[in-house]
């Protein structure tokens, strides 16, 4: 039986100790390790308040494509990707304090809730060598520029007016 409430929860919800109804994913369950948070999560699952659902491959693919566009694919954990994919699939709201998750949620047209302050605008990121300025679609091996040997950093893309 699916819940009427369409809220997909990430691990921060359980770590903060919220008694809440919604959905979560297997990877989020795996992420919750501390004893008190684990007890809360297991109690919410056994009471039926929280349903654990695995997102479809199609939804995961859509989320990964959006994360590639924003440049955040390397910053999102498998649990983050699952949370976004499940919310995308269920047309649900995401409950997360993770700015990267919020950013990709907004790109996907998903609403989100936070325990703290959320993002104000979408930021697209890119990998840039701090030495020669070369731009990369993904982090080069070891985080080092193959051209000049300098470190590569993730920075916001400049907004065009």
Curated annotation (Swiss-Prot):
Renumbered residue ranges of the record's region Flexible linker: 118-123
GO biological process: maturation of SSU-rRNA
Domain of life (superkingdom): Archaea
Entries under SMART domains matching the protein: PINc (SM00670)
Pfam family, one: PIN_6
Residue sites binding Mn(2+) per the record: 10
Protein EC: 3.1.-.-
Binding-site list for Zn(2+): 129, 132, 145, 148
Region (Zinc ribbon): 124-159
PINc domain residues: 5-103
Keywords, comma-separated and alphabetical: Endonuclease, Hydrolase, Manganese, Metal-binding, Nuclease, Ribosome biogenesis, RNA-binding, rRNA-binding, Toxin-antitoxin system, Zinc
Presence of keyword Zinc: yes
One GO location term (cellular component): preribosome, small subunit precursor
Entry similarity comment: Belongs to the PINc/VapC protein family.
Free-text comment on this protein's domains from its UniProt entry: Has 2 structurally independent domains; the N-terminal PINc domain which binds Mn(2+), rRNA substrate and probably has endoribonuclease activity, and the C-terminal zinc ribbon domain which also binds rRNA substrate.
UniProt xrefs under HAMAP family: VapC_Nob1
Protein role: Toxic component of a type II toxin-antitoxin (TA) system. Processes pre-16S-rRNA at its 3' end (the D-site) to yield the mature 3' end.
Protein name (database record): Endoribonuclease Nob1
Organism the protein comes from: Pyrococcus abyssi (strain GE5 / Orsay)
Phylogenetic lineage: Archaea, Methanobacteriati, Methanobacteriota, Thermococci, Thermococcales
Gene this protein is translated from: nob1
């Amino acid at each position: 039986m699916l819940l009427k409430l369409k809220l997909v929860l990430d691990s921060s919800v359980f770590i903060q100790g919220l008694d809440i109804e919604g959905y979560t994913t297997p990877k989020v369950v795996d992420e919750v390790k501390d004893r008190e948070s684990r007890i809360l999560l297991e109690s919410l699952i056994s009471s039926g308040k929280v349903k654990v659902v695995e997102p479809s491959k199609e939804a995961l693919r859509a989320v990964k494509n959006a994360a590639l566009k924003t440049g955040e694919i390397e910053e999102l954990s498998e649990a983050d990707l699952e949370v976004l994919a499940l919310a995308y699939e269920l047309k649900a709201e995401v409950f997360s304090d993770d700015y990267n998750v919020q950013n990709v949620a907004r790109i996907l047209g998903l609403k989100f809730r936070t325990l703290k302050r959320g993002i104000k605008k979408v930021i697209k990121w890119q990998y840039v060598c701090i030495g020669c300025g070369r731009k990369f679609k993904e982090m080069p091996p070891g985080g080092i520029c193959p051209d000049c040997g300098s470190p590569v950093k993730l920075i916001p893309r400049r907004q065009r007016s």
